[in-house]
Amino acid sequence: MEIPIKIIQASKSDLAEIEALQTLSLPAEKQLISHILEESIRKCADTFLLARDENQLLGYVLGDPQPHNPQCLEMHSLVIDSGHQRQGLGTLLLAALKEVAVELDYKAIRLKSPDELLSYFEMNGFIDEETSLYAASQGYSMIWFNPFYLEVQ
């Protein structure tokens, strides 16, 4: 029997699990500190999405409106438990974030991609905006456009 994956909005009760997942999955310099995660849950509940099975957090995606362009979301984190990588969870979370962007009428989702993830984000519908410096190495500024927003314009 297969256990279904649920995509839900993050809540304050998820904070300890989110912190534990990022501690196991990210280098220390890329981890968000507790009060920033808590503030993100409070301010960005619509765009802080979790992938869960029955009783375990498997991954999350965090995006919020860009301060200088509030019609666009900026994706800050996409974190998947190491035991569940390469099973489509990241793609599932990105699809859920795109769905939220459409529902909330965001024009686009932007992200910064390191070289090694460029093809992954391209596979998920993001295009390279421009080559940029990212985390002291070459990286890419990528964007996904809301197709429904483009149709209306």
Region spans (language model):
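A short beta-loop-alpha structural element at the N-terminal edge
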Residues: 4-18
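Active-site rim helix/loop that mediates acceptor-substrate recognition in acyltransferases
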Residues: 26-53, 62
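C-terminal "cap" of GNAT-fold acetyltransferases
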Residues: 49, 114-115, 124, 134-153
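Conserved beta-strand in the GNAT
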Residues: 50, 56-65, 72-74, 79
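A conserved beta-turn-beta hairpin within the catalytic core of GNAT-like acetyltransferases
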Residues: 65-76, 85, 135-138
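Conserved acetyl-CoA-binding loop-helix of GNAT-fold acetyltransferases
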Residues: 80, 86-99
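Conserved GNAT acetyl-CoA-binding A-motif
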Residues: 101-113
